[in-house]
């Protein structure tokens, strides 16, 4: 029953993403490049197993026939590597609060990409949200003299990754496998370079730490698979509302469990961002109710 509920799958996938900081507490101070290398190396056998389990029979010839998607996978995996390295750095260096901010503002970056590249028109609620988010980031710049760089990098990179994936025609497991294969040479070079330079920790780590390195693959991929199943069986409104669960959990973990520094400046900054997002959430709910009412009257929703 759980697997048939799109809403529950969406909530579960974002819940898993939200609690990932707990996992990365087991790998404190590890270099993001080493985590990237290990994640790619272990993702490939995991994805091959998933494809076998799902009886995915996409052949090399079919993949090669769509060269546009093949090249887009190269672009998307490059962007995702930046996003993931930034994310893992924040997880392993007590910067979960900034990661939380990054994911709170990701939807606003997605809106901007739609406006710039797809010529979409901003709704009044989206305009208001952007103003409040800019005010929140600007307030930190004014008070601290610097921007929340990690948050901005994570938010923009993840939004760009999602934007690029819209144009990839492969199914999820095929595209994820191709993305991993594109990064495989980089992962192998990184592994040997880090080990030879003495900066790598995998070969000298204890058994528990090695297992944690291996688990970076399922910790990254399983929520994504649940999320994809959710998208196919629930409304975009539900997805749009559920996406704020992840940064909310990360925020609560950072402040109340990890005791990260949360002063008045960050309080004002986050409050402005939350206020802006509230306009987007209310707009989503209003749009959903409006379409539901139209459907009840036999009018085609827009």
Give the location of each predicted region.
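C-terminal-most transmembrane helix of multi-pass membrane proteins
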Residues: 40, 244, 248-302
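C-terminal transmembrane-helix exit sites in multi-pass transporters
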Residues: 89, 106-125, 248-267
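Hydrophobic transmembrane alpha-helices of multi-pass small-molecule transport proteins
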Residues: 125-141, 154, 265-284
């Amino acid at each position: 029953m759980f697997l048939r509920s799109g809403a529950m799958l969406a909530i579960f996938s974002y819940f898993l993403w939200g609690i990932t900081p707990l996992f990365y507490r087991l790998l404190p101070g590890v270099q993001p490049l080493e985590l990237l290398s290990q994640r790619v190396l272990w993702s490939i056998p995991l994805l091959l197993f998933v494809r076998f389990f799902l009886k995915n029979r996409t052949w090399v010839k079919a993949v090669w026939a769509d060269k546009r998607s093949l090249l887009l996978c190269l672009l998307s995996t490059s962007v995702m590597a930046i996003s993931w390295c930034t994310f893992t750095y924040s997880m392993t260096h007590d910067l979960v609060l900034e990661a939380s901010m990054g994911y709170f503002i990701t939807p606003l970056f997605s809106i901007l990409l739609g406006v710039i590249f797809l010529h979409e028109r901003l709704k009044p609620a989206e305009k208001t949200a952007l103003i409040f988010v800019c005010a929140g980031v600007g307030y930190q710049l004014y008070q601290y003299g610097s921007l929340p760089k990690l948050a901005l990098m994570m938010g923009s990179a993840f939004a760009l990754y999602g934007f690029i994936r819209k144009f990839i025609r492969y199914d999820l497991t095929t595209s994820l496998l191709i993305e991993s294969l594109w990064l495989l040479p980089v992962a192998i070079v990184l592994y040997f370079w880090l080990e030879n330079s003495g900066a790598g920790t995998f070969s000298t780590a204890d058994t528990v730490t090695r297992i944690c390195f291996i688990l970076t693959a399922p910790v990254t991929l399983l929520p994504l698979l649940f999320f994809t199943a959710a998208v196919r069986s629930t409304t975009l409104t539900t997805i749009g509302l559920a996406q704020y669960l992840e940064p909310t959990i990360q925020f609560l973990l950072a402040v109340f469990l990890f005791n990260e520094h949360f002063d008045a400046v960050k309080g004002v900054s986050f409050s402005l961002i939350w206020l802006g997002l509230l306009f987007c959430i209310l707009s989503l709910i209003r749009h959903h109710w409006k379409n539901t009412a139209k459907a009840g009257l036999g009018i085609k929703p827009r």
